């Protein structure tokens, strides 16, 4: 098979891998919205751990959620995890 024909076959077949059989929706998602959902589905990454406040009078502490929020976080009661496109996972405070 000549190179041109082979390339055309590859270009026609390759996009099929991005769609599931059920409804033709893209498997890779929208790059932003479902990144955190996929991350949380892998193991116990949404388990809460104790949050340590590093500065008195500040809402920022350390580690509100296991293996996810890193070193910048806030108390467990006001903390939620966010996913920043191209920057990864982090935390934000609700207050």
Curated annotation (Swiss-Prot):
Keyword Secreted: yes
Intrachain disulfide bonds: 64-73, 69-81, 74-91, 79-93
GO cellular component annotations of the record: extracellular region; host cell postsynaptic membrane
Keywords, comma-separated and alphabetical: Acetylcholine receptor inhibiting toxin, Disulfide bond, Gamma-carboxyglutamic acid, Hydroxylation, Ion channel impairing toxin, Neurotoxin, Postsynaptic neurotoxin, Secreted, Signal, Toxin
Modification type 4-hydroxyproline: residues: 56
Tissue note: Expressed by the venom duct.
Subcellular localization(s) per the UniProt record: Secreted
Signal peptide: 1-24
Residues bearing PTM 4-carboxyglutamate: 50
Keyword DNA repair appears in the UniProt entry: no
Propeptide segment residues: 25-45
Main localization, broad class: secreted
One annotated GO molecular function: toxin activity
Function of the protein: Alpha-conotoxins act on postsynaptic membranes, they bind to the nicotinic acetylcholine receptors (nAChR) and thus inhibit them. Through its two C-terminal domains, this homodimeric protein would bind to two nAChR allosteric sites, located outside the nAChR C-loop of the principal binding face and at the adjacent binding interface in a clockwise direction. This toxin specifically blocks mammalian neuronal nAChR of the alpha-7/CHRNA7, alpha-3-beta-2/CHRNA3-CHRNB2 and alpha-4-beta-2/CHRNA4-CHRNB2 subtypes.
Record's comment describing the protein's domains: The cysteine framework is XX (C-CC-C-CC-C-C-C-C). Displays a mini-granulin fold, a structure composed of two short, stacked beta-hairpins connected by two parallel disulfide bonds. This newly described fold is derived from the same cysteine connectivity as knottins (ICK fold). The name 'mini-granulin fold' comes from the structural homology with the N-terminal region of the human granulin.
Self-association and partners: Hetero-, homo- or pseudo-homodimer (identical sequence, different post-translational modifications).
Family assignment from sequence similarity: Belongs to the conotoxin D superfamily.
Protein's UniProt name: Alpha-conotoxin-like Cp20.4
Organism lineage: Eukaryota, Metazoa, Spiralia, Lophotrochozoa, Mollusca
């Amino acid at each position: 098979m000549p190179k041109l024909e082979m390339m055309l076959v590859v270009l026609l077949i390759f996009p099929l891998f991005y769609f599931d059989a059920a409804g033709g929706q893209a498997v890779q998602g929208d790059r932003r919205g479902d990144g955190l959902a996929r991350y949380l589905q892998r193991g116990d990454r949404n388990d809460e751990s104790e949050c340590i406040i590093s500065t008195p009078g500040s809402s920022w502490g350390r580690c509100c959620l296991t293996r996810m929020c890193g070193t910048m976080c806030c108390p467990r009661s006001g903390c939620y995890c966010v996913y920043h496109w191209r920057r990864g996972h982090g935390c934000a405070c609700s207050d």
